[in-house]
């Protein structure tokens, strides 16, 4: 009886132990399993986005903390925007695409983060780091790629290009004095380059929603978007690679091909190789037959030239579709020809205008914008009210610009022919020119304009301690 009681006690302890082990094995790990048909596992696309945040965004955040101040605060906002996008991508990997109006509601957390970043720049225009803040503010709209189809990658590149306008200013100010700012620029631009690579791999033609989960809605996805789950720790480093596989062809000698053998056989003939040449009689020699000289050079019929189908001369110039549209905060005016009625009237202080390859056209920009760039245009006229940043003309020809209000700086680079009509309020603007010709400034005088040429030729002398450069005055 005693033995039976002891056996029962041991059996009971074994059952309790098995129950404990079973509970530990059967419980799903955190974030896994299915709830209401939604798989809680992390999709490869989300893991790749986590890698982007843990590497590029983390590097940018580290360099921003080194600079501290407004730059650090701004960078923390950028980090928050990427976390909001990570939460949205997690939802996309688990739910099917809803109606467009539902998508707009689901995108609201990201939109609010972007707006917060742009508002911070506007509220800190007096900051010593304003160019840093502007680089981020003008390009953070790249996070809106999730609403772009069918090619979100190029959209991110355009926003990256908008950032370089200001990062170039940062490099100009600090590249010889403080390399911390150079590291900051590099780490920030790397974010968008890496994001383009991520999009090419996981969302090439637009956002890829789940095909199996339930349809997303504000109710079903609110918990994901609002909770903003923390990022998982970075994965451990991969194990060291094994030894390389043996090279199978190490002991194999290359066997000579028949064509190569024949070639060496001919070369080994030495002087005997000329025995195979055919003798040319005098009647076929041009210098001994006057009739051949009279005919001039005759092409061999077997060597008629056929133009290559890929020859650039045979290709007609490609026609591009004219563009006049607002993308984010950037007005794109491209490939306009023979248009003198182009007008941009609904403008904001945050917006920039980029004008590219327009010919024989005129554009009027009303209101106040941040900056205007005229690139690769010919016989183009630009009329604008106010610009708070810079107007830049580059790689262009025969440009006319009329300022109705104010502009602090006008830059002219690699341009032939540029006429600037200034208003009374714009007479204090700075004009910076390089590698350009036929530049004239027209200032108002007695209800008319008086023209002044911008010097193109300069005289440089050594005054004993430094070089002194001044415009060369050539009298006719």
Curated annotation (Swiss-Prot):
SUPFAM superfamilies cross-referenced by the UniProt entry: C-terminal domain of adenylylcyclase associated protein, N-terminal domain of adenylylcyclase associated protein, CAP
Keywords associated with the record: Cell membrane, Membrane, Phosphoprotein
Xref: InterPro entries: Adenylate_cyclase-assoc_CAP, Adenylate_cyclase-assoc_CAP_C, Adenylate_cyclase-assoc_CAP_N, C-CAP_CF_C-like, CAP/MinC_C, CAP_C_sf, CAP_CS_C, CAP_CS_N
Modified sites of kind Phosphoserine: 300, 308
Listed Pro residues bias regions: 230-247
PROSITE patterns found in the cross-reference section: C_CAP_COFACTOR_C (PS51329), CAP_1 (PS01088), CAP_2 (PS01089)
Residue ranges annotated for the C-CAP/cofactor C-like domain, each copy included: 317-454
Tissue: Expressed in the heart, skeletal muscle, and brain.
Compositional bias of kind Polar residues: 288-299
Membrane topology: Peripheral membrane protein
GO CC term, one of those recorded: plasma membrane
Phenotype reported upon loss of the gene: Knockout male mice have a reduced survival rate, while females survive at close to the expected levels. Knockout mice are also prone to eye infections due to eye developmental defects, and surviving males develop dilated cardiomyopathy by 12 months of age. Male and female mice with cardiomyocyte-specific CAP2 deletion die suddenly due to complete heart block.
GO biological process, one term: presynaptic actin cytoskeleton organization
UniProt feature, compositional bias: Low complexity: 300-317
Compartments (UniProt record): Cell membrane
Annotated GO MF terms: actin binding; identical protein binding
A Pfam family the protein falls into: CAP_C
Function: Involved in the regulation of actin polymerization.
Stated name of the protein: Adenylyl cyclase-associated protein 2
Species this protein is from: Mus musculus (Mouse)
Gene name per UniProt: Cap2
